[in-house]
Amino acid sequence: QVWRVNNFDTISLLKACNQGCKYATNSMESLYPHIKSKDLRKVIDDYNTQHIEIGDKCHEMLNVVHADEKDPKPMASMFAKMSIDLKMLADSSDEKVAELMFDGCNMGIKTVGKCLNKYTSASGGSKGIAKDLIDVEKNFANNLMEFL
């Protein structure tokens, strides 16, 4: 597959998708200790794997043009982890885990959707990855509904 990847919009979109995948996997992994239901754990495991796979695709495409990945800012990651930990202190139920993940899905859909609208000159391959990520977020949210 040939990508027209060497332009600002393509690189920016791939970095945004990659960063979003990292935020998602970091959040899922920080919630693992709180999950009691095997069914919820399986859903989260499945979608964690899908986020890792999409992040890997972004990484591969960014490597083609020697562009660095965009990691979540350390302070933002620390704040997100602390926020999750505080929310789980107040309510450590599987319902709360599902609610936090559901909110994250909606944030991901909104953020990646905005990036798709902003980076209109991005390559078809990078737009495809962004759309795949949005689909993963929508499906994840739908699968979380039964745990809310």
Descriptions of predicted regions:
Residues 3-35, 96-120:
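Alpha-helical bundle segments that constitute or directly flank the non-heme di-iron/ferroxidase center
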Residues 9-17, 38-56, 94-100, 124-136:
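Alpha-helical scaffold segments that form or flank carboxylate-/histidine-based iron centers
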Residues 18, 22, 32, 48-52, ...:
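Generic structural concept
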Residues 25, 55-62, 83-86, 90, ...:
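A structural signal for well-ordered alpha-helices, especially hydrophobic packing surfaces
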Residues 35, 52, 66-69, 120-124:
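Residues at alpha-helix boundaries and short interhelical turns
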Residues 41-75, 144-148:
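Conserved alpha-helical segments that form or flank metal/cofactor-binding pockets of metalloenzymes
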Residues 60-109:
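Carboxylate-rich helix-loop segments that flank metal/cofactor sites and access channels
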